């Protein structure tokens, strides 16, 4: 199946929105570095696992935000332009990937 190419960017996002996503990812990156330090410093396993869970939740929130935005903008635009079936199929494929994790 050919992917929907004309909607592959975040061009519809404002600079502020992109900055918010980038800042969230930078915070998550810092959390991951903190976990790495915890491992290197032989911290208690449960404490490390709690932090890993927090990172997973933060990543899931970023992904859900992007997924929602994709549905509202990219998929909606594709439907309006008559290419909705392919965009919906692609969206469903992404949902399947999320439910596997």
Swiss-Prot record:
Effect of disrupting the coding gene: Cells lacking this gene display a slightly enhanced ability to grow into medium containing high levels of copper.
Keyword Metal-binding: yes
GO cellular component terms given for this protein: cytoplasm; protein-DNA complex
Binding-site positions, Cu cation: 45, 70, 74
Gene Ontology MF annotations: DNA-binding transcription repressor activity; metal ion binding; transcription cis-regulatory region binding
Chief site of localization: cytoplasm
Paired cysteines (S-S): none
CDD domains cross-referenced by the UniProt entry: BsCsoR-like_DUF156
Swiss-Prot/TrEMBL keywords: Copper, Cytoplasm, DNA-binding, Metal-binding, Repressor, Transcription, Transcription regulation
Listed GO biological process terms: negative regulation of DNA-templated transcription
Cellular compartment(s): Cytoplasm
Region named Disordered: 1-22
Matches recorded under InterPro entries: Metal_Tscrpt_repr, Metal_Tscrpt_repr_sf
Subunit structure: Homotetramer. Binds DNA with a stoichiometry of 2 tetramers per DNA.
Miscellaneous notes: Can also bind other divalent metal ions (zinc, cobalt and nickel), but these metals are poor regulators of DNA binding.
Function: Copper-sensitive repressor that has a key role in copper homeostasis. Negatively regulates expression of the copZA operon and of cutJ/ycnJ. In the absence of copper ions, binds with high affinity to the copZA promoter and represses the transcription. In the presence of copper ions, CsoR binds Cu(1+), which significantly decreases its DNA binding affinity and leads to the transcription of the genes.
Sequence similarity: Belongs to the CsoR family.
Protein name, as recorded: Copper-sensing transcriptional repressor CsoR
